A protein has these predicted regions:
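Auxiliary Fe-S-binding modules of radical SAM enzymes
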Residues: 1-52, 56, 83, 87-90, ...
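Short cysteine clusters
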Residues: 39, 60, 64-67
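Short functional micro-motifs and their immediate structural scaffolds
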Residues: 44-47, 65, 69-72
Length: 284
C-alpha cells in the first residue's frame, strides 16, 4: 500500500472559530459535509468562517465508490431544516453559504424543493449572503432541476466527479453524459456553473484534460480538481498520488480553455476557496 505523501498531511487546528461553528451546528441539529466526508480542509475553512451545510439528512440513496457518507435508508426530510440553516448562516456571519445534499432518489422531486426552500430561507434572513448549491443530478428530471434553477442560487454546482471511462466504477447510479446535460441546462438558465473532478482513481492526465474540455464546451464557469483520499478499506483504492505540480498544469490548461476559474491542488475539494472562485466567475 502506497503511503500518503507528505503534501497530503494537514494539521487539525481547532481554533475558537472552529469550535464556535461546531457548537452552532450541534445547537441547531445541522450536518456539515465537512465532517461527514472527513474533509482535510475542515480547519482552514471553519477558522475562516465558512462551512458547507448538508441538507436532507445524513444518509444517501446512492453508494459512490469514493464517498464516506452513510448509505442506509434515509429518514424523512425535516421541513424546519431550511430555517435552521438560515439561522446558522446568520449566527456564523457568512458571506458565502454553501448548501449541499445527499442524493434522495426516494423522494418524488429528488429533494429539489427542499434545496430551493433552503436557498430562499437564507436569502430572506441574510440578504447579502451569496448562496451556492451543490446538488445531485435529480436523475436528469427537468421539473426538479427547474425548481432549483428558479431559486436562482448564485452558483450551481453539480459534480462530474471522474473521467468518462471510470464513471461506472466510481458512481454507478450516475452518468457522465447526464451530469454534463445538467450543467448545460443550468448554464442555459443563466446560472454560474461549477463542477469537480476527483483524481487518483485510475484516470490518465489526458483524460483529466478531456474532462475539462467537455466542461468548458458546456460553458462551465468553475472547475475544482483534488486528490482522492480513501475514506475506508471498503472504498476504492488510491491508484495514483498526483504531485502538486500537475495540478498547477491542469489549472493553466483549464483556464486556457475558457473556464473562468480552476481551483486545483491535492487538497482541493468542491467547496474549497468557493468564495474566491465565485468572485472570479463573476468577473468572468
Amino acid at each position: 500500500k502506497a503511503r500518503k505523501p507528505e503534501w497530503m498531511r494537514v494539521p487539525l487546528d481547532t481554533g475558537p472559530t472552529y469550535r464556535e461553528i461546531k457548537k452552532t451546528m450541534r445547537d441547531l441539529d445541522l450536518v456539515t459535509v465537512c465532517e461527514e466526508a472527513g474533509c482535510p480542509n475542515i480547519s482552514e475553512c471553519w477558522n475562516d468562517g465558512t462551512a458547507t451545510f448538508m441538507v436532507l439528512g445524513e444518509r444517501c440513496t446512492r453508494a459512490c465508490g469514493f464517498c464516506h457518507v452513510d448509505t442506509r435508508k434515509p429518514a424523512m426530510a425535516d421541513p424546519d431544516e431550511p430555517v435552521r440553516v438560515a439561522e446558522a448562516v446568520e449566527r456564523m456571519g457568512l458571506t458565502h453559504a454553501i448548501v449541499t445534499m445527499v442524493a434522495r432518489d426516494d423522494l418524488a422531486d429528488g429533494g429539489a424543493q427542499h434545496v430551493a426552500d433552503t436557498v430562499q430561507a437564507i436569502r430572506a434572513r441574510v440578504p447579502d449572503c451569496r448562496v451556492e448549491v451543490l446538488v445531485s443530478d435529480f436523475k436528469g428530471d427537468d421539473a426538479s432541476l427547474q425548481v432549483v434553477f428558479d431559486a436562482r442560487p448564485d452558483v450551481f454546482n453539480h459534480n462530474i466527479e471522474t473521467v468518462a471511462r471510470l464513471q461506472r466504477a466510481v458512481r454507478p447510479s450516475a452518468s457522465y453524459a447526464r451530469s454534463l446535460s445538467v450543467l448545460a441546462r443550468a448554464a442555459q438558465a443563466g446560472l454560474v456553473t461549477k463542477s469537480s473532478i476527483i483524481v487518483g482513481m485510475g484516470e490518465t492526465d489526458t483524460e483529466v484534460v478531456q474532462t475539462m474540455a467537455d466542461l468548458a464546451a458546456i460553458d462551465c464557469d468553475i472547475v475544482t480538481i483534488g486528490q482522492y483520499l480513501r475514506p475506508t478499506s471498503h472504498h476504492l483504492p488510491v491508484v495514483t498520488w498526483w504531485p502538486p505540480s500537475v495540478f498547477g498544469e491542469w489549472k493553466q490548461q483549464g483556464e486556457a480553455m475558457g473556464i473562468d476559474h480552476v481551483e486545483a491542488s491535492p487538497l482541493t475539494r468542491s467547496s474549497y476557496h468557493a468564495r474566491e472562485a465565485a468572485d472570479a466567475a463573476e468577473r468572468g
